[in-house]
């Protein structure tokens, strides 16, 4: 169970909720602020002064006053009308993370919802009630309206949810878990759908996967370096200290540790006529390290956003209810674009290492396409082509999304972040990257084995053994698609990196 303190939740907690399915609830000390804000909203709802979202319409209809008797229907109508999502459902793990993020936002005590709303969200997480949320339809301002409306619909007994492996109508799903729908009070519907939690959940998932891919890239690229008998001189700490970038320094140190003790490296330390390796070998710390730095910058933004109150209007500490724009997901959009760039570049340089290893003119005496009998066998020829295709896909998907604003809601919401699909694309990019890195691992393993009787280092030997437990040596042509998929799984699960038995830089 993760106890979430609003404003202080950590990335480690959020990753545990997303990756391990941990349950989560707010710390009890959040309740007084939540209830105080709810009391202030109830007071405003009973008054005559117009307060956006409490006794007015929404968006372009904000100038229309709503009678006190209609405020409950107003909130229900808001949820129903905004359930306009389309496309494939959000992955359940990411949907659960989204709910946890909504709890954190409500827990700041600035949204004005009753504690009953918090308790129902906590109950849904605890009982495994996961709303079915179509993944397309948000422009990332005014919040992730459509997807969050599908979440809120389940809370009022509408929509659909998964529970116990079954997809049920919202009311039935709640009943299955021993929960009851809630009747929304003033502003509660708006508080549930205003916010960036959908975009942020997807961006965090991309971040967590991206960091794991970066760790795998360090291990696999070290194995590739040994496969082509690359030099470790570019990993010397003095080089990286002279530049000073933290990620670069850490990447070089990790690769030095991975290659320490390699007999392959020692065999050509003296007398090698090659003066410099190609950039995809020589500049690995500069590229992967830079990607690590970018991922960390995105992590800082997303950690802040995860703990933010992104509702509108907000109940301030002095009791005033003020309209603002915290629902605008521009920070999340920028973070997602940064993650996309990092994923693309990790894959781009990895693909060049694959191309290097299969090319006999560049691989320092490895056989063409890493097969013992080239000609009769094509070896990894088309596996390299697959990595080129996926690399190109990722390059196209790395184009920024935040620059593509368009006016919505009759020009009331005239600049939007597009953070939702900017974050959502990261899942596809990670899938592609895992295949690129997994294929590189297969190529590097073949290359290292061709250097026998010389052996690689102990850490990389353990990595090679872990790979071979899933992907046998390719001695003759066979259908390689299952092997590529198996290697990609080892990348995504972290099994390949863990096999090295060394500490890795932390996010």
UniProtKB/Swiss-Prot annotation:
EC category: lyase
Principal subcellular localisation of the protein: cytoplasm
Chain positions with 2,3-didehydroalanine (Ser) modification: 142
EC number: 4.3.1.3
Pfam families: Lyase_aromatic (PF00221)
Pathway annotation: Amino-acid degradation; L-histidine degradation into L-glutamate; N-formimidoyl-L-glutamate from L-histidine: step 1/3
Cross-link (5-imidazolinone (Ala-Gly)): 141-143
PANTHER family referenced in this protein's UniProt entry, alphabetically: HISTIDINE AMMONIA-LYASE
Family stated for the protein in its record: Belongs to the PAL/histidase family.
Name listed for the protein in its UniProt record: Histidine ammonia-lyase
Source organism: Cereibacter sphaeroides (strain ATCC 17023 / DSM 158 / JCM 6121 / CCUG 31486 / LMG 2827 / NBRC 12203 / NCIMB 8253 / ATH 2.4.1.) (Rhodobacter sphaeroides)
